[in-house]
């Protein structure tokens, strides 16, 4: 069994902290929360400290933040129904674009692998795809409305321009651009959860997806492409996603976030029972029937709900978490 070792506990935000995001280089991260501010933290020696506070971009809670793949831009999604784009072109971070269009709170934001596309989703049940049209210019490429409820999360595929979204309607949906007419379409609906799907994340090559839900389970989904050797039918030559594993019994309350480490293959969960749990694929796992085991759990990782967890993209086994308790914690997993 592994261990989750606490390395740092950080404070600075007022109120609950909703989101944390590692910079692609892994030596800086950003945090956001109820206080309408974004904090950018960096490591000096062995001490993490706030380097910058961005407090003039939003009028309400900031729900999520994400760095662009190049690390030059930061996008923030807010309950004020806008998404702000920040960059450091002049030496200091400033808000260079504000994306408007959603009718209600923006819940999530995600950059595509190339950084040329941005996705947002909202309580208004819609998913928007934006194209980067030039310096600080973004054009709406699609407004997608297949969900019947609040959309909680959007995440781009790590190697393709394929988008996944998770919703209060208990489903996950996949979107891709039709090559003929360049229209964005919903290409798959993933149904198995029995309550809100809070979080989703792809594995390193994007052939599998993990989801977490209010139903206290995590599920592993596998992509079956046209011509697959497993004999899974693919109507209309579209990739089919099947739930190949359900992990249940470890969480006592809603699971709010899940992160699939691209370096180690470990899965981390953030739970409403104040805990963080780490899962690993077993050595005898089969492609069409994978099995995962919990290798460690920190039951009282925070004093209140854990809202977000994210693996460091560079430092293997380093995990960051944030909570309603107003703290950010940095952990190290030892297997």
Swiss-Prot record:
GO terms for cellular component: cytosolic [4Fe-4S] assembly targeting complex; metallochaperone complex. The keyword Amino-acid biosynthesis does not apply. WD repeats lie at residues 12-51, 57-96, 101-140, 146-185, 192-231, 250-289, 301-335. GO terms for biological process: iron-sulfur cluster assembly; protein maturation. The keyword Translocase does not apply. InterPro entries: CIAO1/Cia1, G-protein_beta_WD-40_rep, WD40/YVTN_repeat-like_dom_sf, WD40_repeat_CS, WD40_repeat_dom_sf, WD40_rpt. Keywords: Repeat, WD repeat. Pfam families: WD40. Essential component of the cytosolic iron-sulfur (Fe/S) protein assembly machinery. Required for the maturation of extramitochondrial Fe/S proteins. Belongs to the WD repeat CIA1 family. This is Probable cytosolic iron-sulfur protein assembly protein Ciao1. The lineage of its organism: Eukaryota, Metazoa, Ecdysozoa, Arthropoda, Hexapoda.
């Amino acid at each position: 069994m592994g261990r989750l070792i606490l390395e740092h506990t950080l404070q600075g935000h007022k109120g609950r902290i909703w989101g944390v995001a590692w910079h692609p280089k892994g030596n800086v991260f950003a945090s956001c929360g109820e206080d309408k501010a974004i904090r950018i933290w960096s490591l000096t020696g062995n001490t993490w400290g706030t380097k910058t506070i961005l407090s003039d971009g939003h009028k309400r809670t900031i729900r999520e933040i994400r760095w662009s793949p190049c690390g030059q831009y930061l996008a923030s999604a807010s309950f004020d129904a806008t998404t702000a784009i920040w960059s450091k072109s002049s030496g200091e971070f400033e808000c260079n674009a504000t994306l408007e269009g959603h009718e209600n709170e923006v819940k999530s934001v995600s950059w595509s692998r190339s950084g040329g596309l941005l996705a947002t989703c909202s309580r208004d049940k819609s998913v928007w795809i934006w194209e980067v049209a030039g310096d600080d210019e973004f054009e709406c490429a699609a407004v997608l409305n297949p969900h019947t409820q609040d959309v909680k999360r959007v995440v781009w595929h790590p190697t393709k321009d394929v988008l996944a979204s998770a919703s209060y309607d208990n489903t996950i949906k996949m979107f891709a651009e039709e090559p003929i007419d360049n229209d964005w379409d919903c290409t798959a609906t993933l149904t198995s959860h029995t309550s809100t799907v809070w979080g989703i994340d792809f594995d390193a090559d994007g052939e599998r997806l993990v989801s977490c839900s209010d139903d206290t389970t995590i599920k592993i989904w596998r992509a079956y492409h046209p011509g697959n050797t497993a004999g899974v039918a693919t109507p209309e030559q579209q990739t089919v996603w099947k739930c190949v594993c359900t992990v249940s019994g470890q969480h006592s309350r809603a699971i709010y976030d899940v992160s699939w480490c691209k370096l180690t293959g470990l899965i981390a969960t953030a739970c409403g029972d104040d805990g963080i749990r780490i899962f690993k694929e077993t050595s005898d796992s089969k492609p069409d029937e994978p099995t995962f085991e919990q290798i460690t759990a920190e039951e009282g990782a925070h004093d209140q709900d854990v809202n977000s967890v994210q693996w460091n993209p560079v430092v293997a086994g380093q995990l960051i978490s944030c909570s309603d308790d107003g703290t950010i914690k940095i952990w190290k997993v030892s297997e």
